[in-house]
Regions:
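Hydrophobic core of transmembrane alpha-helices in multi-pass small-molecule transporters
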Residues: 22, 98, 110-128, 243-244, ...
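Extracytoplasmic
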Residues: 12-44, 62-67, 163, 250-260
Length: 390
């Protein structure tokens, strides 16, 4: 057995890092609560309410460009210089500053300040993700790096599943935006608490044993160093894949509620569990893909491929049951999950094969959702989350 394959996952550092993954999901999904409320209170057009998501996600591109320019100017990778752990903490600090903008945004009922605050929060997330993703991959056997990312992504989707519920309860005293009685000013307290949490986690990470630098693993294989990005098709094709995946994920989440309202005459309080299941679907898929992290034994992995996804589905059921949502039409989704489990088993942990299978199933799900009706179309569109998950 090679030295690399003998490396064990650093679970202590991994658990600490997953806290920031949780925050990414918590805030991103909570935007779906802000969108309909600000649309109503500020009399926004549909395209303006969509700007809430746009302002949050576009800064990942902006942040990457800023990072690239700064690294080029310094002639050295910034995170290699300051450290990955420190980079995550700085990113959390930037996000905390963004939450402060929600105070004047609420008091002045300013749409511009609202999206500015979200932009700054997302800018901090951009730096956090730049540092955290490669750090997670480095915490053990490189061959299981993608599985550790899936596990961390599963924690991210715990945040996406419970975030909207907690934010709605904190702002409105209810889980349904349709029943909101509070004014826009009520966003101040929960986002101040969120900002404080960012700072607390930044401090905890700085004091933790999370490595500040990534140790390069020695390899006996001959390395063919290439000078141009064009020489690394897995890099630029991967960038295209991420662009498409994020576009599908965000567009589906942002418009699913409107689709159910227009085509099925659902009230906003009826829509809540469907949107929640969409986000939970990403958690279900990522937990399934992380089975290899827990054991290298094929039998154990096969068992976990069933236990983990249905455990994640159980979290969705628990959260929505506590908030008195009607889940009766959604229980049959357990059979849809079987398609994802089969695809994961067929991928055999190979990232390229997994990408091909999940992309194909995602396309099929979208086509079924477009050309069918009734619960079949709803299940198909929600299942897009399953196939965007890894």
């Amino acid at each position: 057995m090679s030295e690399q394959s003998a490396l064990k996952t650093n679970y202590g550092a991994l658990i600490t890092l997953t806290t920031v993954f949780f925050f990414w999901g918590f805030v991103a999904a909570s935007n779906d609560i802000l969108m309909p409320v600000f649309k109503k209170e500020l009399d926004l057009a549909q395209w303006q309410s969509q700007m809430i998501s746009f302002a949050f996600y576009v800064d990942y591109t902006v942040g990457s460009i800023i990072y690239l320019i700064a690294s080029s100017a310094l002639k050295r990778d910034i995170l290699s210089k300051i450290g990955y752990k420190k980079g995550i903490s700085i990113g959390l600090g930037i996000s905390a500053v963004g939450t402060l903008l929600f105070i004047p945004a609420a008091r002045l009922e300013s749409f511009e300040l609202l999206i500015s605050g979200l932009f700054v929060v997302g800018l901090g997330f951009s730096l956090q993700q730049t540092a955290a993703n490669p750090l997670v991959i480095s915490l053990g056997d490189p061959k299981k790096g993608s599985q550790r990312l899936s596990l961390a992504g599963g924690v991210n989707n715990i945040g996406t599943t419970i975030g909207p519920v907690l934010i709605a309860l904190a702002i409105f005293g209810t889980t349904s935006a349709a029943d909101a009685k509070a004014s826009i000013e009520s966003i101040e307290t929960p986002y101040l608490v969120l900002g404080s949490a960012f700072l607390l986690v930044a401090l905890l990470i700085m004091l933790s044993k999370v490595p500040n630098h990534i140790q390069q693993q020695e390899s006996t294989e001959e390395v063919n160093v290439k000078k141009s990005v064009k020489d690394y098709p897995q890099l630029y094709l991967g960038m295209i894949a991420i662009f498409v995946y994020v576009g599908v994920e965000v567009a589906t989440a942002g418009n699913l509620g409107e689709y159910l309202k227009v085509n099925f005459d659902m009230e906003p309080n009826q829509i809540t569990p469907y949107v929640s299941l969409y986000w939970a679907s990403l958690m279900i898929g990522r937990w399934t893909s992380a089975a290899g992290v827990f054991s290298s034994k094929p039998m154990t992995q096969n068992i976990l491929r069933f236990v983990l996804p249905y455990g994640a589905f159980g979290i969705f059921v628990l959260i929505n049951t506590i908030t008195n949502q009607d889940l009766t039409p959604l229980y049959y989704y357990v059979f849809v999950i079987l398609f994802m489990i089969a695809a994961e088993a067929m991928s055999k942990g190979n990232p390229a094969r997994q990408l091909m299978l999940f992309s194909g199933l995602g396309i099929i799900a979208l086509l079924i959702g477009i050309f069918s009706d009734g619960m079949v179309s709803i299940y198909a569109l929600i299942s897009v989350g399953l196939f965007c998950s890894t």
